[in-house]
Swiss-Prot record:
Reactions catalysed according to its record: RX + glutathione = an S-substituted glutathione + a halide anion + H(+)
Organism: Mus musculus
In-chain residues carrying the UniProt-annotated modification N-acetylmethionine: 1
Gene that specifies this protein: Gsta4
Lineage of the species this protein comes from: Eukaryota, Metazoa, Chordata, Craniata, Vertebrata
Record-annotated GST N-terminal domain positions: 3-83
Function summary: Conjugation of reduced glutathione to a wide number of exogenous and endogenous hydrophobic electrophiles.
Protein known as: Glutathione S-transferase A4
Length: 222
């Protein structure tokens, strides 16, 4: 029996959360080792596991993988969440990159000053409602299918749901003008593996709080 993938990262969302989502949606069990001290981080660097000196790090299939985008692409292809051909794959890439841009705006906000954080959240909500969500509402309207690409679950769907839920944590009614996205959210959330991941007690991480921010600052020295 193959070993479970092992994820090395902080005990929080950051750049690892989309990886957790993808594995969970694929029904893949995984282990986690949480980065809590500077010494752990320096040992990982010394051991040569961090290609560019950065986490996340994922141990899978005899490999130590770094760089979030590369990890997500590998997992999507491995678990049949990456479309049926190159044309579907590039659309999945475009949609996933778009939602990743939105989610990274949210991920970095807790590390800002209170004033900057408030301004960031206002900008995030504005961008979500005027730049990102209208695009996905139109995609769903134009093809009339249940999923974003190829009428089957893909990385793009999983990451869009992740992004929607993150933005809803800032403003619960953010989807009020997007009925197709509301239906999409309900539909994808009810896929059994995803529904399980959304339940309390799963490996899904909560929004970043003060202690999480301090651990990241201490370990990475910024």
């Amino acid at each position: 029996m193959a070993a479970k993938p092992k994820l090395y990262y902080f005990n929080g969302r950051g750049r690892m959360e989309s990886i957790r989502w993808l594995l969970a949606a694929a029904g893949v069990e995984f282990e986690e080792e949480f980065l809590e001290t500077r010494e752990q981080y320096e040992k990982m660097q010394k051991d040569g596991h961090l290609l560019f000196g950065q986490v996340p790090l994922v141990e899978i299939d005899g490999m130590m993988l770094t760089q979030t985008r590369a990890i997500l692409s590998y997992l999507a292809a491995k678990y049949n969440l990456y479309g049926k051909d190159l044309k579907e794959r590039v659309r999945i890439d475009m949609y996933a990159d778009g939602t990743q841009d939105l989610m990274m705006m949210i991920a970095v906000a807790p590390f800002k000053t209170p004033k900057e954080k408030e301004e960031s959240y206002d900008l995030i909500l504005s961008r979500a409602k005027t730049r990102y969500f209208p695009v996905f509402e139109k995609i769903l309207k134009d093809h009339g299918e249940a999923f974003l690409v190829g009428n089957q679950l893909s990385w793009a769907d999983i990451q869009l749901l992740e992004a929607i839920l993150m933005v809803e944590e800032l403003s619960a009614p953010v989807l009020s003008d997007f009925p197709l996205l509301q239906a999409f959210k309900t539909r994808i959330s009810n896929i059994p593996t995803i529904k399980k991941f959304l339940q309390p007690g799963s490996q899904r991480k909560p929004p970043p709080d003060g202690p999480y921010v301090e651990v990241v600052r201490t370990v990475l020295k910024f």
